[in-house]
Amino acid sequence: MRKALLVTHVSGFVPQFEMNNVHILQNMGYEVHYASNFHNPSYGDDNSRLEGTGIICHQIDFERSPFKRKNITAYRQLKKLMEEHEFDLVHCHTPMGGALARLAAHNTHTGPVIYTAHGFHFFKGAPLINWMIYYPVECYLSRYTDVLICINVEDYKRAK
């Protein structure tokens, strides 16, 4: 059976926004895995909406801030997960989930990798520090991204 991995840094994202994609993948014969920080539910008080969906969940100790050392642990956990499961597809969301998943996928030769950018942190009017940090990181990570999905025109134009 083919395997797909969905990655977000906070749990709750998939049941809130991605269930149609999960159903499509499952109907295409994929076993769907979800890597997230389930200790940090978002878009709801708990992770009960994942029960009965057939999604296989994996705890990854993501932190939202890119400056937290715990994200090194999260990267290692993701890399190990990818090595153990040999995923046929990785679809990542959220800035930290997207960054660490793309690095881990590259270093484990896992792919293709899809990244959905739900609004870059560098945009017209954003603080200069955002441009100094996030823009070069995203430019670097773009080489490890097979498909980039942008949800707004400004991000799409910038990504081209």
What are these language model-derived features?
Residues 5-70, 154-160:
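N-terminal strand-loop element at the rim of the active site
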Residues 3-5, 105-121, 138, 149:
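Active-site proximal beta-strand in glycosyltransferases
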